[in-house]
Regions:
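Conserved thiamine diphosphate
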Residues: 1-206, 220
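Thiamine diphosphate
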Residues: 91-93, 104-122, 166-331
Length: 331
């Protein structure tokens, strides 16, 4: 929408003197396709239903629906349950609809923190849809590009933390967007990625004490904390695609740490929310497959709660700090 665009998009610019509109994406070249910006009315149920239907009749169009905050998507839960998650299984109708859901614990309270990631993961089976939480611009781009270049259609549920729009570590090189690159279901720690520089040097894989698996914004909180603490015996891995879960790829990544490290899943969400209950069995299978010495996956995150997040900034900050402390405390 033009009305609801945030500062990272500026899809519509308005001249306050004469009230004219300028759409930058319609002024790229003389022979380009038209980019249409529509101010939809504020009914998640109606609008998502329309977009789902549009994705069925126009499969070669990239149809994206973005919630103002992911928390508000539950206003369209009927469409999600009855159509997005199960339409292909029930009626063999394939949809490539993309749902962009701002999700991340940034201190904005219980109505502006959670897209209810756990609900989407609970609906996942039979490869019915994709659930992602991308942490680089390039991976986000390739996830959208893949939607159109595949010869089949699946709904894509994308968590989109707003704080990553201005995070100094959340960047990609220009070549990362090229055809030579692709979508990565798991991303390395910045400290072991040959394309990134300026981070502490980690110990050899045999000396790593903790392997932290996580997804989304919390990775950057942990990365920044580790840089300050100079902890060189803790390595972080990002699960960019939560479903279908990349278990076989994870086997390859975790195998070097099987002899000595302990393995943890870290999330910002309360224990009864987020990805924990969905990914736990997949990760446990991975550890069993690599015959890890410490073969149990453990949880680090908020305690179970009826509310997605606290409404008090001070409590939010203390909870975030507690998660970081647990990750980097000595075993």
């Amino acid at each position: 929408s033009g009305r609801g665009t945030f500062s990272q998009r500026h899809s519509v610019l308005r001249n306050q003197k004469n009230n004219t509109r300028y759409v930058p994406l319609n002024n790229i070249s003389n022979n380009q396709k038209q980019f249409e910006v529509v101010d939809s009315f504020l009914s998640e149920l109606a609008v998502l239903g329309f977009e789902y239907g549009y994705s069925l009749v126009e499969p070669n169009t990239l149809t994206l629906w973005e919630a103002q905050f992911g928390d508000f998507a539950n206003g369209a839960q009927v469409v999600i349950d009855q159509f997005v998650a199960s339409g292909e299984r029930k009626w063999r109708r394939a949809s490539g609809l993309v749902m962009l859901l701002p999700h991340g614990y940034e201190g904005q309270g219980p109505e502006h923190s959670s897209a209810r990631l756990e609900r989407f993961l609970q609906l996942c089976s039979n490869d019915n849809m994709q659930v992602m939480n991308c942490t680089t611009p390039a991976n986000y781009f390739h996830a959208l590009r893949r939607q159109m270049h595949r010869d089949f259609r699946k709904p894509l549920i994308m968590m989109t933390p707003k704080s990553l729009l201005r995070n100094k570590y959340c960047v990609s090189n220009l070549e990362d967007f090229s055809k030579a690159n692709t979508f990565h279901r798991i991303l390395w720690d910045h400290a072991i990625d040959p394309q990134t520089k300026g981070f502490i040097k980690l110990k050899e894989s045999s000396e790593i004490k903790k392997v932290i698996l996580c997804s989304g914004k919390v990775y950057f909180d942990l990365l920044e904390a580790r840089e300050k603490l100079k902890k060189d015996d803790v390595i972080l891995f990002r699960i960019e695609q939560l479903y279908p879960f990349p278990a076989k790829t994870l086997v390859k990544e975790l195998k070097p740490y099987a002899k000595n490290a302990k393995f943890f899943w870290c999330q910002e969400e309360p224990k009864n929310m987020g990805a924990w209950f969905s990914v736990r069995d997949y990760i446990q299978w991975t550890l069993d497959t690599i015959k890890a010495k410490n073969s149990k996956i453990s949880y680090i995150g908020r305690s179970p709660d009826a509310s997605p997040a606290t409404g008090y900034a001070k409590r939010h900050n203390s909870q975030q700090q507690e998660i970081i402390n647990k990750v980097f405390e000595y075993l």
